[in-house]
């Protein structure tokens, strides 16, 4: 019917439903983004403060099929990944989220399903099988004993290995032939984060503000 059809059905149609409409506290919280610049890792681990920052930022890309008239990816920031439905200051929702993550000792992940080895028009999207392998590993705890490295520009932690995923895919800079171009594009995205967050800094804690990316220049 459309490029991105939605459907609904009665809850009674689900055989293993629960009648009280409640579940336990999650052990993992996953944010989904689509980075058309090709600079974000396919999987990153976030601290509660970083989770609040990225939740407020709501960075992703509009891609064909999600909105009428979109034929190629467009970078966008949608507060709390759903700006029209958040009437109060974003920090209220972000603080609630980070408190829940902290109180329940949950892990928070940022999964990127965008482009790798270059940006849109220069490369291809991350393979679905890699995204599945990373998500399954995160949810099963298979990454608990894996070495993580801190991304110098964005600050989050990135695994160095994951079964079923080439190691270089986990470090986006390693997939680009032109490392200087990668640095320039990554700095461009970092600036976009910083400029977008200016409108929210009043009322946001110093800890959350410190999760902002930094502009590094060529490394």
Predicted regions: what they are:
Residues 1-175, 192-195:
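Glycine-rich, often acidic-flanked micro-motifs
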Residues 169, 174-219:
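Generic C-terminus detector
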């Amino acid at each position: 019917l459309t490029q991105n059809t939605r459907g609904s059905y009665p809850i009674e149609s689900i055989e293993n439903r629960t009648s009280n409409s409640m579940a336990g506290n999650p052990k993992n919280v996953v944010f989904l983004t689509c980075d058309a610049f090709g600079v974000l890792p396919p999987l990153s681990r976030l601290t509660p403060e970083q989770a609040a920052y990225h939740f407020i930022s709501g960075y992703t890309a509009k891609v064909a099929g999600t909105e009428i008239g979109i034929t190629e990816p467009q970078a966008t920031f949608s507060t709390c990944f759903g700006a029209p439905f958040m009437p109060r200051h974003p920090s209220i929702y972000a603080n609630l989220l980070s408190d829940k993550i902290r109180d329940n000792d949950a892990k928070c992940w940022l999964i990127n399903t965008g482009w790798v080895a270059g940006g849109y028009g220069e490369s291809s999207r991350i393979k679905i099988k890699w995204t599945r392998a990373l998500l399954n590993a995160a949810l099963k705890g298979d990454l608990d004993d894996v070495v993580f490295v801190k991304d110098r520009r964005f600050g989050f932690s990135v695994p160095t290995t994951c079964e079923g995923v080439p190691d270089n895919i986990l470090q986006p800079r390693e997939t680009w032939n032109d490392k200087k171009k990668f640095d320039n594009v990554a700095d461009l995205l970092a600036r976009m984060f910083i400029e977008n967050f200016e409108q929210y800094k009043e009322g946001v804690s110093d800890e959350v503000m410190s999760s902002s990316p930094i502009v590094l220049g060529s490394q």
